[in-house]
């Protein structure tokens, strides 16, 4: 009878899967039938969700798959989908996406889109090819030209381009020369001179003889700058006479050294035992004058000082670089003569040999000049010893050589 009632109550019910649980004391079991145990709820997936589509569910929530540049933007009133941008793209006040354009640049926006501000004097938009192309505006006769390789410079036979540098093309057989200072002119300095940037032709000699005198005949003015073989400069007096007779230069030199006016004589064996010193005779008084030969007297007065430049000997010594050397100079060549000087006080160096040599000298302006070097070679030491005092005078020391040119006027 009990089985018949159970079937009538639920004819489609399945047989119990487990032991029927009874309500314990104080519990109310409202499940009917009381023996039925509830299984885990079945998750229902709507049939319109494609597992590979942009929508998916997580924990019963519908979600959207996002890829860059779409992102979830967290806001105070809830999350929303937005576009991630950098400084080149912005969202305007109407919520529309737009390109961010710097106000300092040449780009601008119009109703038709983005445009470019250009200088019509230097740039042009060329539409001849069917496409609007930005180009450089070239002047018709401005020496610039364009080709498939780019913009270039049009040059004639007087110019050339070397290592991407525009240069003047100089005829190797001509008188022009190119240096770091620019384009210059090579000329015969016996016939021409440059004065204040102007090339001038030397005037024809107006006299067969020209003379130059400098210093004091009494050897009482120690204005000369001499230098010892220990490379110590000192003061000395001189009297100089030079005569150019139709291209033959005769130089007569007197020298006097007074220990009371020569200046400081350094101590030490190297300095005290020095026996040689050099005097330079120069006709370039402002350009290259190591012994400080003073402005003297010219006869005739319109004679150029270049009239007293000695000619360079074919066997002249190498160029003496005044930029790298103290102006002591001792040549192994040239004329050598022996003299007996006049001494006073305790100073006595014995006889003095003098070697005279025309020497090319590179001055501080990087120009080479011909000077006459007089190297005085004392037989014994004493002149540069601070404990020895007195004077020594020698002269005339005479040197004769060809002049660089016959006497010329200014």
UniProtKB/Swiss-Prot annotation:
GO biological process, one term: adhesion receptor-mediated virion attachment to host cell
Transmembrane segments: none
Statement: the UniProt record of this protein carries the keyword Ribonucleoprotein: no
One Pfam family matching this protein: Av_adeno_fibre
Chain segments carrying region Disordered: 1-22
Keywords linked to the UniProt accession: Capsid protein, Host nucleus, Host-virus interaction, Late protein, Viral attachment to host adhesion receptor, Viral attachment to host cell, Virion, Virus entry into host cell
UniProt cross-references to InterPro entries, sorted A to Z: AdHead_fibreRBD (IPR031822), Avian_adenovirus_fibre_N (IPR010537), Fiber_prot_C_sf (IPR038486)
A cellular component term, taken from the record's GO annotations: viral capsid
Predominant cellular place of this UniProt entry's protein: virion
Sequence ranges of Basic and acidic residues compositional bias: 1-10
Protein role: Forms spikes that protrude from each vertex of the icosahedral capsid. Interacts with host receptor to provide virion initial attachment to target cell. Fiber proteins are shed during virus entry, when virus is still at the cell surface.
Additional remark text: All late proteins expressed from the major late promoter are produced by alternative splicing and alternative polyadenylation of the same gene giving rise to non-overlapping ORFs. A leader sequence is present in the N-terminus of all these mRNAs and is recognized by the viral shutoff protein to provide expression although conventional translation via ribosome scanning from the cap has been shut off in the host cell.
Description of its domains: The tail region anchors the fiber to penton base capsomers, whereas the shaft, built from several repeated motifs, allows the knob to protrude from the virion.
Family: Belongs to the adenoviridae fiber family.
Protein name from the UniProt record: Fiber protein 2
Lineage, uppermost ranks: Viruses, Varidnaviria, Bamfordvirae, Preplasmiviricota, Tectiliviricetes
